Amino acid sequence: MIDVSAYLGHFAYRQLRHNTGAGLVQYMDRFGIQRAVVSSAAAITYRNPQAGNEEVAAEVAAHRSRLIPFAVLSPVYAGWQDDLKICHDQFGMKGVRLYPKWHNYTLTDPRCRAFVNAAADMGMVISIPVRVEDPRQQGWLIDVPDLNLDEVARLVRACPKARFIVANGSGIAGSALGRGGKDIPGNYAVDISRVSVEFGNELGQLISLLGEDRILFGTGMPFQYPGPALAKLDMLEASAAVKEKIRSQNAVRWLGLPADQ
């Protein structure tokens, strides 16, 4: 099983458990998760996100067989070109996570498109978390809303050569991303961390709308517990073959991992 939506490090507004490399691997073992894509939780609120990437690179060094590092960078922070090259060439990071609401830009900003195209040229995947934490849990100093899904769709259209993961989102089936159309390329996949199975069965809808090959397993740990994501797979009315694709096979292909992982 491969989790495409996990984190390491501290977060400015709440304590996170199991947030070290060793601690997260032990936590993954409890739930039968073999590998996880991780990025810096601290970099979400750092003025210079590269400091968080350096911390993650150090944490995953002893766990590269289990943890797949992604960078957190801001397209509007000076010097991102150098930081992106370091993350790719020196840290071996497979992708980048973008947090426009936290880093004060929009996905439609031309600088964001330039960043995405540069990362795509390096073969890196672009992950866009729609939410970091429930707004009801946010501290009194901040008010960060969920990312607008139509804004994500506009970036997907503008960068057809990039590979995207839309993470920790809900309502996707009813958005432009779910409805699709001739003008939206099939260059994005969706993780299951916040989509429903029982109420409205958004997961089933997404399988029908996007296809079973574009649904990925994700938990959001340690911001969220892994249990609900596992329960969704158990409850999903789909064949064992489809569930196995969601558990790991789709992530292997989407992330460009060796076929035996």
Spans of model-derived segments:
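Alpha-helical scaffolding within the catalytic cores
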Residues: 19-26, 51-58, 80-83, 149-152, ...
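Active-site neighborhood of phospho(di)ester-bond hydrolases with catalytic His/Asp-centered motifs
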Residues: 1-4, 37-40, 70-72, 97, ...
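Acidic-and-aromatic substrate-binding clefts and catalytic sites of carbohydrate-active enzymes
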Residues: 12-19, 43-50, 74-80, 103-110, ...
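Catalytic pocket-lining loop regions of alpha/beta-barrel enzymes
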Residues: 91-95, 108-216
